[in-house]
Design a protein with these regions (language model features):
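Conserved NAD(P)H cofactor-binding loop of Rossmann-fold oxidoreductase domains
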Residues: 88-93, 238
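Residue(s) in the substrate-gating loop at a strand-loop-helix junction
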Residues: 140
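Conserved glycine-rich cofactor-binding loop
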Residues: 5-6
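Active-site helix of classical SDR
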Residues: 119, 154, 162
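Substrate-binding pocket helix/loop in short-chain dehydrogenase/reductase
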Residues: 95-108, 198
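Short C-terminal tail/terminal secondary-structure segment
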Residues: 218, 229-251
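Short, small/polar-rich loop/turn modules that mediate ligand/substrate recognition or access, typified
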Residues: 170, 175, 228-230
Length: 251
């Protein structure tokens, strides 16, 4: 699970561990990884099944090394292979009219380029080793809206990439889907210290919870989701789906 130290990725890790999986979470900060693993390992049932890996989603040149490191880690825990990739890492930013080229590249490199090449690597690994598995891409309901930021452009890209990967990998027993959260109560979206999940701009009147997104992720990569292929599952509370024509949104 890339970007697993906080927010949706952290709660996905918790949900996967609760379901019995061995989990590798990645992040750029060794300290944040240590804190996240410390919190998750407070549950004794998860110990021995959780591994951390320092990885920058923009450093495509290091992906082979980092993936081999992940294989070594799970192998030391008795797992013969990795069969699920969750492309979750992402950053916001680079909106018109004030976006800089540097900010634009950071968003696209993290949210789209990194996902493309990590999926290329992982898909090749599954095919070469005849492992049936899953790729789950974390998109955004913003991919339903007109794009005026690098973030939204990147999520449009994730939507298309999910379809392409699903079609090309399905014959090899690899299931690819996307999950597209709407406004979610995570540190990336909520203001510092905000603990009120009320969101009057959302048809259900509140933000989605990362736990809700994580529970759906478990379904999509489990046998329960085997016939769901190439889909983006929108978990928005209605934002961008029943209000898709509303340009006055805050994420």
């Amino acid at each position: 699970i890339t970007g697993g130290t906080s927010g949706i990725g952290f709660h996905m890790a918790k949900a996967f561990l609760r379901s019995g999986a061995a989990v590798v979470i990645t992040g750029r900060s060794e300290e944040r990884l240590r804190l996240a693993c410390g919190e998750l390992n407070e549950d004794d049932h998860y110990k021995g099944r959780l591994f951390d890996l320092v990885m920058d989603n923009t450093r495509v040149d290091l992906f082979h090394d980092r993936f081999q490191k992940a294989l070594d880690k799970v192998g030391s825990g008795g797992c013969p292979h990795i069969d699920i990739l969750v492309n979750n890492a992402g950053v916001l930013g680079a909106s018109m009219p004030n976006a800089t080229e540097e900010a634009f590249d950071k968003v696209i490199d993290t949210n789209l380029k990194g996902v493309f090449f990590l999926s290329q690597l992982f898909g090749g690994y599954l095919k070469a080793n005849k492992v049936e598995g899953n790729i789950l891409n974390v998109g955004s309901s913003s991919c339903l809206r007109p794009a005026t930021s690098a973030y939204t452009l990147s999520k449009w890209g994730i939507r298309g990439l999910t379809l392409g990967l699903a079609k090309s990998l399905a014959p090899y027993g690899v299931t690819v889907n996307g999950i597209a959260p709407g406004p979610t109560a995570t540190p990336m979206l909520l203001k510092d210290g905000q603990d009120n999940i009320t969101n009057k701009g959302n048809p259900i009147g509140r933000y989605a919870l990362p736990e809700e997104i994580a529970n759906m992720a478990v379904v999509l990569v489990s046998p329960m989701g085997r016939t769901i292929v190439g889909d983006m599952v929108y978990m928005t509370g209605g934002a961008a789906t029943v209000t898709y024509d509303d340009m006055d949104y805050t994420f």
